[in-house]
């Protein structure tokens, strides 16, 4: 009986996330729930952008190539595609805007920071969404991005912050009241 009671109490907090066909749809749905928990400034020298090696996530079927991105403070992005080295450039314009491309003025796009913490990084391409082919750049810390696919990584991001929204103070107050009542009627 005690197990059933605990299962019923825990059930509302064990929410299964819906399946999405594309990474873009999933990010559109999950981003509003986690946006407030991330860092907000790309200009900070201690920002995760510069401290973490990022793996680019994709929802292309059959894609197995690991693309590891390292953002250097000098404006260079060193990219390893399964060990083969490549490079790009970036320039931080404001706290939440960055240009990323082959060079700052060639094959480059303006992105806006949507979410950044020590494990996940999401940029959204600036402009009219109807004209944009790839709306988001989604990166994960190397330890996450090399072992999970895009939908599992997004679930991990949501789970990380879902627990932070849980009203622990409320639970502690209720628990204290229950213990107090039990001691009183003992």
Model-flagged regions — what are they?
Residues 1-72, 78-80, 84-85, 100-186:
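Lipid interaction determinants
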Residues 94-98:
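Short, conserved beta-turn/loop elements at beta-strand boundaries and strand-helix junctions
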């Amino acid at each position: 009986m005690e197990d059933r009671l605990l299962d019923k109490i825990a059930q509302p907090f064990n929410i299964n996330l819906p399946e999405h066909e594309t990474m873009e749809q999933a990010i559109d749905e999950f981003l509003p729930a986690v946006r407030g928990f991330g860092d907000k400034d790309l200009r900070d020298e201690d920002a995760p952008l510069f401290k973490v090696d990022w793996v680019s996530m994709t929802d292309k079927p059959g894609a197995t190539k690991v693309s590891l991105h390292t953002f250097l403070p000098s404006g260079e992005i060193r990219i390893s595609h399964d060990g083969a080295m490549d490079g790009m450039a970036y320039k931080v314009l404001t706290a939440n805007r960055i240009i990323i491309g082959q060079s700052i003025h060639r094959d480059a796009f303006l992105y806006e920071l949507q979410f950044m913490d020590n494990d996940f990084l999401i940029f959204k391409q600036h402009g009219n969404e109807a004209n944009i082919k790839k709306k988001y750049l989604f990166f994960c810390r190397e330890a996450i991005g090399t072992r999970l696919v895009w939908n599992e990584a997004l679930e991990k991001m949501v789970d990380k912050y879902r627990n932070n929204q849980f009203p622990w103070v409320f639970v502690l107050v209720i628990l204290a009241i229950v213990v107090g009542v039990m001691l009183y009627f003992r």
